Amino acid sequence: MAQVGINLVRFAPDRDSPLGLLAPGPTSRRIDPALLDRLDYFVKCLKDQGIYVRLDLMHYRMFRPGDGVDCLMSQTNASGHVYCGGPALFFQPRATEIYREFAAELLRHTNPYTKLRYVDDPALATFGMVNETSIFSGGLTETGRRTLDGLFQDWLKTHPGKERDRFLSETEQRWYESTKAYLRQLGVKAPIACTNITYGTPNGQLQALVGDQIENNRYWDSPHRDWRWFWERPMLKERGGVYRSMARAAVAGKPFLVTEFNLNDNQYRSEAQLLTLAYASLQDWDGILWWDYHNSYTAGSGFDKFMGTTGGNGELFSIRDNPMMMAQFGLASLAFRRGYISPARTAIDVTYADVFSATARDRGQGRRGSSPDSPFEALPLMCRVRSRYDGASSPRADLLIQLGGAPGAGAGDPHRLVLETPAPGAAVDELRTWRAVRERMQQLDLPAISAPGDTTFRSDTGQLAWDTKEGVLTIDSSKLQAAVGFVGQKRLQLADFTIDFASDPAGAAQPTFAAISLCSLDGLPLKQSARILLTAIGRAEDTGEIREQGPEGDFAFIGGLAPTLVEPVRGRIVWQGRKLRAFPLTAAGERMTAITPDAEGDGQVLTIGGDGTTWYELVPDLGT
């Protein structure tokens, strides 16, 4: 794990054994000492390799009848996934009591292999209070619903005429404040986050006010319909993909960590690493946790229907054995940590006249997305964009966009742009916000962004260009240059290299979809680097793998067996200037027989794809 650049691992230990710490029995309150010992030793091993740990304190826990908590006892029900007891966690004292009991027992426990309590170990870099749960999410028993309704009626006596959302928000915020204070009393020193999905602007605001950092979970093409079917859509053909919703979740002045992310196992998965690297770097996010490295779901767990249990890379969420993911993981990690792609030059914050308004819900932190004229639709592909909430301090942005407000609000401040609420029933002009922001940026002499309606989104740094019509991303920085997507029959000119699939090398078939990158390994610009990693990966699948097309145009994945088959990416890499040699690399990173590129005019050309590898090491040719 450390060799490929992993430096943070997330654990969710509060699940039933053998997959978690909770021992069998009528209650979920007993920790299995043997399983705790395994966790302790794994934490020690990670620490030895310089890998930090993120610990969830409430994630998979399913309360049991003996716990005395009035909540749904099953993870899956008609309302979807109910983790942590669902909304009941935030208003049932018994649920809070059990939560704190588990936290105290785990965090004050001394790891025998490190000789440190978890509250004292600096390797535990961050904690999450709750996973994917809010009082705004579904999943209550009928008696639980009546209890919550009664609490709301009591609240109305002192808050007449106020919305139910305000009551829910206040209730949840009080829980997070008291729970965070309790964890500090236990001795937790690391940053603490609330949850990792934003359930609308009220929930986003309370996370900003209470949490030390903001977190978000997000997936592309996640299985649906019995957790077996997915759409086989390339994100590169969709404007912004999931990075728009991630940008909505990020908050000005707060660290931002993506605690779950994946592009699931469709044939376009090779786009995942470089796309994510590009826009996490542009947005200046602080970390990406892929879910997951390798899962331990087993037959009969309910998840084996779509995870696969036959070997190969059949688990949809796992990346460990998937060449489309792991062939690029190391370079993406290195480039992210070293800052090979620059953060955006322009910082834009989005604030809300009223976080409880329909405007905030529809054009800002909507639970399931936002309207086409939201500032988060196109701007995150070109500038740095954050949400901003009253009461949460943050540095001044280049431009503050306020959603909603009285006509004329913000007049006299060129750095504040107020977007008034459209009239009810009015047609939505999806370019309205984009147009207004671009005009204001021009007035402020900020870096130019793409014109409204363009299908190619260029970052204000000039390093990224995402052509959503063609489905191609190019990265063009001094230390990393790449092309991702539908590159077949295209010649893509970058600053130091040309990635050429328009010329047919030796009559070989061209790839339809691939990711090709050249990354400096020694930290020098590619023009001077003595070690350049060339990576080329297209499709990969297991032997015998089946994708069954469904009646809705979606697909079901049926895992195959080892060995995994990798499509050769046949093309040409062209450059001018100094002479380089190329070493194809084995799967272990060892050099094979050197290749001398061909001369072409004043430059050289390396034909790739016939060497049985996804990696080449380019080094100066010292023999000339």
Q: Where is each model-derived feature located?
A:
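Surface-exposed loop/edge segments in extracytoplasmic proteins
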Residues: 589-596
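Short, solvent-exposed loop/turn elements at domain surfaces
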Residues: 135-138, 223-225, 542-544
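Long, low-hydrophobicity ectodomains and other hydrophilic envelope-associated domains
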Residues: 327, 333-334, 338-584, 601
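Active-site mouth of glycoside hydrolases
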Residues: 1-211
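Flexible internal linker/loop segments at domain or repeat junctions
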Residues: 222-232, 547-554
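Acidic/polar residues at beta-strand termini and the immediately following turn/coil
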Residues: 111-113, 121, 467, 586, ...
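Catalytic-core region of carbohydrate-active enzymes that cleave or remodel glycosidic bonds
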Residues: 46, 175-191, 199-221, 230-394
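C-terminal beta-strand-rich structural cap/linker in extracellular carbohydrate-active enzymes
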Residues: 602-624
